[in-house]
Amino acid sequence: LEWDCWHTAEHIGDSLLSYAWQLAVQPTARYVRAVATAEKDASPAEVLEFAVTGGRILASMVRTSRAHVRAYHPAGMSDPEGFAGMGCYEALLHGNDIARGFGLSLDPPRDVCRRVLARIFPRAPGDLADVDPWSALLWAGARIELPGLPPGPNWPMHPAPRTS
């Protein structure tokens, strides 16, 4: 990752807000033409607040959007569940990037990791069935290597509804 922790947190907030905007407007061929940024003089706590705000707004949009809603994402049209999965993936992987930047580790709930991996990487190899779900998600995002598997593929996300 090339960003510092401040810019990584800003990216999380912008990504999550962008997903929320997609659900709100439901464009079919492009992203909503907007970018969210933290104020340049924001403290580290304030830029993390920006990221949390993006997550809460996305969660609200996911909860209030009907299941049939579809909106553009470069990896394919997504439903609310797909945007939720991609939002979790962004927050988890980049949250881990930030934690590592401070010499810490992130230890998310394994059930969340398992559900995110299954939802946005439905073609994940069966070799991952016995792998810790957090490690599998980090591997899928090319953050770590796993013994006996090729280097993490950094797969494109699959946001399309499960029936697609």
Identify what each model region corresponds to.
Residues 1-4, 18-35, 39-42, 46-164:
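Structured surface interface patches that mediate subunit assembly and partner/cofactor docking
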Residues 11:
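Short acidic/histidine-centered micro-motifs embedded in hydrophobic/aromatic stretches
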Residues 14:
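Active-site HxH/HxHxD metal-binding segment of metal-dependent hydrolases
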